[in-house]
Amino acid sequence: MAPREIQGPRAQEVPTTSDAERAINQGPADVLLCHDHPSLGYRLKGLPIPEADERTSAQVRRLLARVVEAICPKLVVHGHWHHAYETERNGISIKGLDCDNTDRTVALLDLDTLEVEDWDLSDPARRR
């Protein structure tokens, strides 16, 4: 089933099948930055969303899982759920970013090591 057409400002959050194919055709990648998380055998609990949004999100997660399977990233970073967490599935590190203006909403990625460090927004030295 193809994702339904989304209209309005949320449309930019929903990748299309052609977006996924373009990512897959680019070949392997170490990092996947995306809005939602791919379906990799886990669900975030306690975060209710409207049923229509859940259906669209489930379609997007399945589409992203196809991309992950094809490009084999070592790290996936996303922010859709506004819930900070880290997990690992099938050898892939997954980092969810928190809500805007919270301590875990911004992270630094070391491209050499693929280590992710939360950016401390309360540190005046980092507010430049």
Label the predicted regions:
Residues 31-35, 77-78, 96:
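A structural signal for short, well-ordered beta-strand segments and their strand-loop junctions
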Residues 38-43, 67, 71-88, 101-105:
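Active-site environment of divalent metal-dependent phosphoester hydrolases
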Residues 59-69:
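A short, acidic, amphipathic alpha-helical segment used as a generic capping/interface helix at domain edges
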Residues 83-128:
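Binuclear metal-dependent phosphoesterase catalytic core
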